[in-house]
Amino acid sequence: MFTESKITEIYCMADDFCKEFSFQQEKYMIEDKKTGHRNKPNRMSDAEIMVILILFHSGGFRCFKHYYKEYVCKHLEHLFPHRVSYNRFVELEKEVLLPLTIFIKKVLLGTCTGISFVDSTPLHVCRNQRILIHKTFEGLAERGKCSMGWFFGFKLHLIINDKGEILNFMFTPGNVDDREPLKQGKFLKNIKGKLCADKGYIGQALFENLFLNGIQLVTKVKNNMRNSLMSIADRILLRKRALIETVNDELKNIAQIEHSRHRSFSNFIANSLSAIAAYCFFEKKPAIEVNFINDRQLTIF
């Protein structure tokens, strides 16, 4: 649970960003001179809506309606004096999807340190028994398979550094190969050095393409593959790949990035983005201690 000082800090960051975002957005908008628009501002600002969405994932809440009515409206009324009804708040969620996405991408993501970890985690939208009658994500969610078996929903692809900070993320349907996001340059923007992954990312063409872009893909070897030499440092880093599994666990258990009660796709995106934003504000993140010793010894390849 965030303290009031932390909530104020998050609000100041979100409010400063929303003001700059609105200023830049108005410069490129085309004015509609045929019809008149009232342009009446909402009672709650975009920053307040973003903060309330983020706070939901910091306190272990599981029902957003109960959280908004029983916690925000009763215990945080001094921080949010211009509250709206729950139904109106759900409608306003859609309006902050774009600024919330850019806020995460431009402000909250970490910095690459040269050691990164990549992995994907499934986001179930319903039980497997209900796949054929599921209508909310019809045409969007797909069947996929992970280490835990078959599922129906989406995949969250994450890249983190050795400090547990999220460097980039991407949502795809459940049937997309884990290697597909790595083939897109935007997903690997500002990523350099070693990129540790599991056996699902093995691919000679992918390894060569990443190596030409300054990224060394480090994976284990499958049983039916010819063994290859690997440095001790790479072997140690592969043992620490559980770091990104811990990040996925915190997103699903401390935050609530995965549940099967979504009523629309926009609600799913708002919940997922706010969970990632809440994780970025966690003071304690899973991390590994990496120390480099300069022994002035040359390595012969």
Segment roles from a protein language model:
Residues 1-301:
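Short alpha-helical elements
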